[in-house]
Amino acid sequence: EVAVDTETSSLDPHQTDLIGVSLSCKIGKACYIPIGHNSKKCISKDIVLKKLKPLLEDPSIKKIGQNIKFDFIVLFKHGINITSMDDTMLMSYVLDAGKNRHNMDSLSEIHLNHKPITFKDLVGTGKKEINFSSVEVEKAKDYAAEDADITFRLYKKFYKSLKDEKMINIYEVFEKPIIKILDFMEI
């Protein structure tokens, strides 16, 4: 199982450029692959996507995301059809429905007692706001890798809670199948 997160130039998955991909397959361990920053520290997008494709399309490896629908659409536009997906946002919704917000920063603070680096900390706001592609790779790495690690940690916690509270079938039977349906409806 691996947590996957894409960093992009826009919040619209249909109108965005892929800036980087972060991955985590162990709590406390994550990496960031920069591919679209305005920097010489980037790796070729074609090479990265070619290497990631077998991993992300392998049905025997679970891909975990926070609102993975966004990442699915972004990567699908680049020729990768992610299979075997779990979504921490949907898992949170099954566990707590209307109790809390289900964005990653809120979930991290509530369930992991950890305040993550905010997007605004990196890109600024208002007239001084920059595109993520202009963020220094070192700063982007800290932010993006943290996102993948938090997603992986939330997944482990939520999966256990769903099993303990006998709600895993609600997630597996009703919520999880919706991920792929919504993905293809939006493409």
Task: Tell where the protein language model's regions lie, with residue ranges.
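Conserved RNase H-like, two-metal-ion catalytic cores of nucleic-acid enzymes
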Residues: 1-110
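Mixed-charge, glycine-rich, non-catalytic linkers/tails in nucleic-acid processing enzymes
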Residues: 82-83, 117-187
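Glycine-rich, acidic and aromatic/proline-enriched surface loops and short helix-turn segments
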Residues: 113-114
